[in-house]
């Protein structure tokens, strides 16, 4: 049983998957920092000193009544909130990550597949058929008589 598990783990696709997950998590952290620390502060500044992480709607006040200065204060007070600013940050994270995956993974793979397909189209396919000169149907290359029109072939 342990031997089978070892064979399963050592297969290339399992190891590739593990490496992909680790790199994906690290890349996700980089994108998250890019959005939170680099992109959103200037956008918030342009929109009048708005911190997107602190955009929320209070549905029900907590033990300590509002208004709340920040999302953290509202959550500490036990208020029920809709955190649409955090959602905007997550949406921008997703869009950047999706664009990066598209431009660095999907698009190159599609181009590689298209090149491979064009190479296959250039190489003529080997065939074991020929056209009958009398009825123009496909017949075996070694045929001496057409099975369709019964003409003798040379």
Swiss-Prot record:
It is found in: Cell membrane. This is Large-conductance mechanosensitive channel. Homopentamer. The chain crosses the membrane at residues 14-34, 86-106. Gene3D superfamilies: Large-conductance mechanosensitive channel, MscL, domain 1. Belongs to the MscL family. SUPFAM superfamilies: Gated mechanosensitive channel (SSF81330).
């Amino acid at each position: 049983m342990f031997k089978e598990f070892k064979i399963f783990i050592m297969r290339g696709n399992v190891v590739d998957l593990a490496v992909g997950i680790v790199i994906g998590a690290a890349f996700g952290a980089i994108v998250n920092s890019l959005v939170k620390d680099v992109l959103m502060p200037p956008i918030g500044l342009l929109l009048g000193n708005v911190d997107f992480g602190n955009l929320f709607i209070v549905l029900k006040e907590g033990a300590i009544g509002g208004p709340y200065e920040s999302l953290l204060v509202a959550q500490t007070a036990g208020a029920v909130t809709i955190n649409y600013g955090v959602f905007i940050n997550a949406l921008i994270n997703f869009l950047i990550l999706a664009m990066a995956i598209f431009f660095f993974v999907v698009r190159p793979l599609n181009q590689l597949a298209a090149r491979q397909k064009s190479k296959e189209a250039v190489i003529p396919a080997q065939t074991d058929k020929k056209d009958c000169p009398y009825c123009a149907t496909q017949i075996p290359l070694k045929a001496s008589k057409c099975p369709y029109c019964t003409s003798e072939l040379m």
